[in-house]
Amino acid sequence: MHMVGKRVRTRFAPSPTGYLHVGGLRTALYNYLFAKKMNGDFIIRIEDTDQSRKVEGAQQNLIKTLEWAGLVPDESPVHGGNFGPYLQSERLELYAGYCRQLLEDGTAYYCFATSEELEENRQLQMKQGLQPKYNRKWLPEDMGGSMPRSESEKMLASGAPYVIRMKVPDYVSVWFEDIIRGPIEFDSATIDDQVLMKSDGFPTYHFASVIDDHLMEFTHIIRGEEWLPSMPKHLLLYEFFGWEPPKYAHLPLLLNPDRSKLSKRQGDVAVEDYIQKGYSQEAIINFIALLGWNEGEGCEQEVYSMEQLIDRFSLERVGKAGSIFTIDKLNWLEKQYIKNRPAEKIIETIRPLLQEELSSKETMLDREVITGDDYLRQVIELMRERVGFEHEFVTFSSYFFFEPETWEEEAVKKRWTSDTPALLSEFLPTLEGLPEFTSDAIEAALKAFVEPKGLKAAVLIHPLRILASGVSFGPSLYHMLEVLGREAVLRRIRKGMECITVPA
């Protein structure tokens, strides 16, 4: 698999047509992991030869998203390198030179067919049950066609628009060994005379890609299986130029749970969408890595760091079958990372979010305290099992930072009885007088208060939770009260008792 004596070089070559697709991220990730595993180089090349589809700012967004994901290239349009330019639109003269070489060698020819003629020919072939391909009307006589060379020269002299096509040899088979799929063979009868240079002077993807892959000395091309049908054209171009092709690995499709091809119709496909929802870089990379690759039978590990992925990744362990994209798996991975992420790292994320919330809200809590490391660390340790995203430490735990203004109506109806205010009033001095306001002390005091009365702890636990947080769910009540602190808890109890009325 490794080309002996050559430094491994892989590439991710997106077109700047929009946001990075999750399928594109997987292709980039596998190229990155393989290159780093082999102590090689990972390169980004931008394939912008289709000017009609180019989107302003897309190139910058692609590179920014890849760097967010930790896939920092060794060479790119931004990072430079010895094999540039890394934008195909800046390499047009180079492609033109290689195209002239093929014209001189008799492996390419001028084609003056109009789009109307091509469409008419396509429709006719489809009616006949044939696979649509160019009918070679403009293939010169001296290349096995029927068009006199003089006709092409006449059209060229007149300034008529043209494309340049490759001449696919007749009656040959094109064969290669795919690292993932094994040997694959194509019959040249099924291969179209691919356009190499378009009428606007820009090369097609197929031509520019082969030229650049050779000149940039890539050893391995790792890409999606949608490119498999293009392989014979690419391999023939290598043959025309007398170049050794790189090794190829074609990755399986990404599928929706219903096994249809992953598409925006069934959910988000842009990496940017997942970033905005709050998924972490670690969880996304871990999830994407497992969409097609596994470490092997008997291995039950599912949570991997980037370092572990680099160490254990291999193209031989990438499957051929389509990989199911299940959001539940991504959510599960995110929770695993939150459970184990150092509090200090979570604080870096949530403190700016909290400051933003505080700027638009009033709070009775000490702002310096609730944005301080000690307080935030306590909230994180109490809530990390209950949140799915880092931002939920602020949104789902808002009662740690803001006084409740409302109290969950259904919970009040269910848990607040005519006896509740009297019990709370009687218990309040006990809370005020605790020598230490700790979870253990609060729990012991509450039990010591209710047991002599023949009551269960729940008669106070539920009302206290509603008063302290405004909601009926959350972490351990005793730990929550300890984190909030005596002053805030007593104030909330008194405020709530004034505002909550006994249900009729």
UniProtKB/Swiss-Prot annotation:
GO biological process: glutamyl-tRNA aminoacylation
Single GO MF annotation: glutamate-tRNA ligase activity
Keyword tags: Aminoacyl-tRNA synthetase, ATP-binding, Cytoplasm, Ligase, Nucleotide-binding, Protein biosynthesis
Enzyme Commission code(s) on record: 6.1.1.17
Any single GO CC term annotated in Swiss-Prot or TrEMBL for this entry: cytoplasm
Cross-referenced CDD domains: GluRS_core
Main location: cytoplasm
UniProt lineage: Bacteria, Pseudomonadati, Chlorobiota, Chlorobiia, Chlorobiales
Family from the record: Belongs to the class-I aminoacyl-tRNA synthetase family. Glutamate--tRNA ligase type 1 subfamily.
Catalytic activity annotation: tRNA(Glu) + L-glutamate + ATP = L-glutamyl-tRNA(Glu) + AMP + diphosphate
Function: Catalyzes the attachment of glutamate to tRNA(Glu) in a two-step reaction: glutamate is first activated by ATP to form Glu-AMP and then transferred to the acceptor end of tRNA(Glu).
InterPro entries: aa-tRNA-synth_I_cd-bd (IPR045462), aa-tRNA-synth_I_codon-bd_sub2 (IPR020751), aa-tRNA-synth_I_CS (IPR001412), aa_tRNA-synth_I_cd-bd_sf (IPR008925), Glu-tRNA-ligase_bac/mito (IPR004527), Glu/Gln-tRNA-synth (IPR000924), Glu/Gln-tRNA-synth_Ib_cat-dom (IPR020058), GluQ/Sye (IPR049940)
Subunit structure of this chain's protein: Monomer.
Protein name (record): Glutamate--tRNA ligase
Binding-site positions, ATP: K264
Chain positions of motif 'HIGH' region: 14-24
Protein encoded by which gene: gltX
Domain of life: Bacteria
Motif ('KMSKS' region) on chain: 261-265
Record's subcellular location: Cytoplasm
